[in-house]
Amino acid sequence: MARIGSFLIILYLIYALTLCICDDDESNYGGDKGNLFPGFYRSSCPRAEEIVRSVVAKAVARETRMAASLMRLHFHDCFVQGCDGSLLLDTSGSIVTEKNSNPNSRSARGFEVVDEIKAALENECPNTVSCADALTLAARDSSVLTGGPSWMVPLGRRDSTSASLSGSNNNIPAPNNTFNTIVTRFNNQGLDLTDVVALSGSHTIGFSRCTSFRQRLYNQSGNGSPDRTLEQSYAANLRQRCPRSGGDQNLSELDINSAGRFDNSYFKNLIENMGLLNSDEVLFSSNEQSRELVKKYAEDQEEFFEQFAESMIKMGNISPLTGSSGEIRKNCRKINNS
């Protein structure tokens, strides 16, 4: 544990220095994305990124798993109404929270960290930095703080005044989806197969609940048989943690080799038939193009990091609210004047 803490501190210091010397050329991020650009808060809240980074660093130092949780929040937010912070809203008045959808109920976490980020931002720059931008920055910082790539985050999103429970239930890919369903749900958000594989690489960190992979162990095709593509010793280990009944909330690492470090081990696991979720395994077994991408990223971590950063920027640009649309929430859990 002490080694992990020291590793995270070193990464944080390197990361802070890197951000100071990076070029935030606004011309790279405009166009049809509402003129989002990295320097959006340069004048209005110059310490915004520093504040977010500091809070996330403390949270990840307390619990490394939080990095994966924050990245997952960003993913689940962007796939419903775009990256607008709708997932952060609690039920109130006309709002029916997305937190109770099938993909989020009893699994989405990290909301308290977002609250802490927002409180710090409001103290520094009231009514300035959106919850949507704060979550997008937190996802980037979570990558860096666990050893993954960094990227300049286009900023300027505003927060929604609505949520969509049905959108959350229908738009977000599920762990047991088929390959075609997963690709279709990504395509619906303007993301292609390369994005599917690269973004799935975020499963190099974090954990998943037994209920998300039990069917692979006991009833993959509805005939009472396990998924034969699972490596046998790995499957036996998983059955120890995930019984046929009960233990729904028991956790297993998404990456058995390095669940706390962002690297390309996830793709190596897929080649060895040790992907935890069905949605992981199908990337290697169901399509030649995705299989070749898995092999490429398994062989070349730098290639994976570059594509992951590019795909995260692309995902973060899904249907942003900008200009006078939406609002800047004072509290990420509720709309203003509610």
UniProtKB/Swiss-Prot annotation:
Keywords: Calcium, Disulfide bond, Glycoprotein, Heme, Hydrogen peroxide, Iron, Metal-binding, Oxidoreductase, Peroxidase, Secreted, Signal. Glycans are attached at residues 176, 219, 250. Disulfide bonds join 45-125, 78-83, 131-332, 210-242. Ca(2+) 1 binds at residues 77, 80, 82, 84, 86. The record marks 72 as: Transition state stabilizer. It comes from the Eukaryota. GO terms for biological process: hydrogen peroxide catabolic process; response to oxidative stress. The keyword Metal-binding applies. Its EC number is 1.11.1.7. It is an enzyme of class 1 (oxidoreductase). One of its GO terms (molecular function) is heme binding. Substrate binds at residue 173. Its cofactor is heme b; Ca(2+). Binds 1 heme b (iron(II)-protoporphyrin IX) group per subunit. Heme b binds at residue 203. It is found in: Secreted. Residues 1-22 form the signal peptide. The active site is at residue 76. GO terms for cellular component: extracellular region. The keyword Protein biosynthesis does not apply. It catalyses: 2 a phenolic donor + H2O2 = 2 a phenolic radical donor + 2 H2O. Ca(2+) 2 binds at residues 204, 255, 258, 263. There are 73 peroxidase genes in A.thaliana. Belongs to the peroxidase family. Classical plant (class III) peroxidase subfamily. Removal of H(2)O(2), oxidation of toxic reductants, biosynthesis and degradation of lignin, suberization, auxin catabolism, response to environmental stresses such as wounding, pathogen attack and oxidative stress. These functions might be dependent on each isozyme/isoform in each plant tissue. This is Peroxidase 15. It comes from Arabidopsis thaliana.
